[in-house]
Amino acid sequence: MTVIVSSVHADIYMYIDDNGVMHFTNAPTSNQHEYKVYLKERTSVSTRFHATDKYDKLISNASEEFNLDSRLLKAMIKAESDFDPRAISRKGAMGLMQIMPENFKMLNLENPFDPWQNIRAGAQYFKKLYKRFNGKLALSLAAYNAGPTAVDRYKNIPPYQETEEYVRRVLRYYRTFKQL
């Protein structure tokens, strides 16, 4: 079994603006806002492909609550964050299931770095998309990645390289987890 260890050196700071919108940064740039440390620095991250069972109970609970296949949620987490609960994408998506800040309120997500809150919110959001796209898995995954309006606009998987690769990657991981 291979273990990859990398160092991360950054606290995450947060402030809430006058409209109630939460803003996150690793480097506060202004004295105008009251930044609070939201997530303390950690010294190392250990990621192993085969050691994905750490969150199995949380994934199982969310899959039962929203009537989703736990192996699908696990595949999404693998594709989204590689099981790093502190992952932040370049577009600002956060946590295991990479929830965008604009969806926090709708999903009642208070702490995107809390594994249970994030998995539950991601499952809830995916289930909403799955219903919206009539149980079509590929379209639902594309909507999770690119947003539902992009899928509506193209009436198919949007022709975005990132989204096309995301759908293929999740489906590949899903097949793998089904075989385990």
Give the location of each predicted region:
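Catalytic glycan-binding domains that act on GlcNAc-containing polysaccharides
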Residues: 26-180
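N-terminal signal peptide c-region/cleavage motif recognized by signal peptidases
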Residues: 5-7
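Short N-terminal segments immediately surrounding and downstream of signal-peptide cleavage
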Residues: 12-27
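Short loop/turn microsegments at loop-to-beta-strand junctions
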Residues: 10-12, 94-95
